[in-house]
Each structure stands twice: as structure tokens, then as C-alpha cells.
Amino acid sequence: MIYLHIGRHKTGTTSIQYFLRDNQDFLDNHNLIYVTDEKGLAFHEGPRILKNVVENDNKEIESIRKSFEKIVTKKNKDFIFSSESFQNSNPELVYHLFKDIGHEINIISYFREPISYFISSYKQRIQNTDLIFKFSDYINKQENLTKYIDFYENWIKYFPSFTARNFSRKNLKNSDLIYDFMKILLPKLEYQELPEKSEIANRSLSDFGLLFKLVFNNLLKLNMVSIKKPGQFYNYLPEMFTDHSFLDVKNFYLTKDNYERVISMSEQAFNFEKFFPECNFKLKISDLESNRNFRGEFIEITLDALNSLERKGFIEINKNILNSDLSKIFREYLQ
């Protein structure tokens, strides 16, 4: 058996990959082999090359197959391939990559409740870029984000064995993503048999953290600040403002119009339970609660945060930032 994990964005894929990489002995004891590319964390190289393959270019596909074909000849083993990049791959090309390999193939993929999925992906986009667009603009550019039925049907044309799981913690086995994933591979596995796990999380920004990053990106556009250590800066952002609730900006991006727009775009997600009953995505009333209240205190907090980031060497403040500049930017997102 080959388990092909399509790591849909914001569904704990990195945590799964680190666990698989760091527990080779455990996998070996259960006749499992985790296949990765040369970097050793996941199988990103395959989807990356497939992205540039024109139709069924056998030469390119064979070049990828050579990287793992000798490994999967072991008939008494099961194999795991994982990559976020499979989400954007052409299923037909992936089929040609694995066909006639001598193993049955089972697709594994996790799916999120639509509202949280849009929010989490928006936050990550703002965190990792210098973009300044509002949530409403992001929504309008992501029409396919929650078309779960199309995604599923495109893959089962070539891979009829498909396991879909609800990413919600209450739906996970023992409320544990790693255990939930491993139970798919090893149905008889008991929770206490699982090796100790490292906490690896691709954390999202808090709501004020998102607002701060939008303000920061505007300052970048105005050449008032510059980034000196991008990797460290982006990784540090989720750690900021964790001690503040900032209820004045709770879900500030989720206006009634935005909420209704996401709901209307996510019809397939809400009907996905017809295929997989456990994927019955329910909305919370709290999702509708949002605040867009500007306080002068936000400016002081932002200036303190900018100075702290400069002291750490992550950024440089190039020009004197006026309170009026910050106030104008804040109000752009809080109106």
C-alpha cells in the first residue's frame, strides 16, 4: 500500500511530516517507510517537477520515479508520501507517476471548516508577504478554496481509494492530529503506543497581530520601514501580542458581508458530508462576532512593537513614523 498524503494548506501538514521524519524506527517496526526528497522532510520535489510537466511527459515523470522506485519494490512494506504541493498537482500526472508501481494507492487529506479556513489562509498570506489587501479582496480571489467536492471528484477519477478527515479537533481521534493520521495507517494502534511528539505548529497570527502586520506592510510600501532578517521576522510574528486579548478588534475582518460571501462560496464544503459524514462542518455563533473599534492605545503598542523588532535586528525604521500616519492606516481596516 502507498499512502499519498495531500497536505491541504492549514491542516497540520508540517506537524505530520516532522513526526514521520523523526520517528523512522517506530515506522519501521510497523512496516512503514516514509519517502522524502533529498531535503528529508517531505516529498515536495515530485509535485514541484510535475508542475512543469506538459501532459504525460514520460521522460520527466520517469526521472521522478527513479528517485523512489527502488524503495517501493519492497512488497512487505507500506509507504507514505506527503506534500502540501500535491494539493495543486494535476491528479492525472500524479497517477502516471505512481501507476504500475505494484502497490494499491490510498489518498489521505484533511479538510477544514470554511470560515476558519478562509481566515487562517488569509492570515498566513498577510504574514508571509507585503500585501495590504483587505479580507474582502482576498475572498474574491479564492473562489476555489472550499470547493471540496470538485477537489475530491478530480482525484477519485484516478485514485478511487480516498480517505477524507475533518480537521476539527473534536473530530480527531483522541483530539490528536498525529494519532488520527497514524490510525488511518495502523487501525489497531493504541494511543499509548505513539512515540512522544514534538510540538511543531505553523501558528497563525492573532487578530491584533494580523492588524499590526497590515499596518507594517503599509509602512513598507511607504519606505518607512525595511526588513533585515525576513525568516526570523516572519517566524517571530505569531509570538507577538499573545498576552493581549484586544477584543476591540476581534474578527475585525469578518464583516457581515464577508461572512455571507464565504458562506455562499462554500456550498460544496457544507455538502461534503454527503460523501464523508464526518465532514459535517458546523458554524459557531461566535464567528459572527466582530469588533472594529480604533483606540489611540493601538498606536503606542505598535510603536513599541516596531522599536522592539528593530532592537532584535529584524527590521529597520527608516523614517520618523507619525501618529497621524498610523492612525490613518488603522482606520482603513477598522471602518
Where are these regions (language model features)?
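Anion-recognition interface
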Residues: M1-Q335
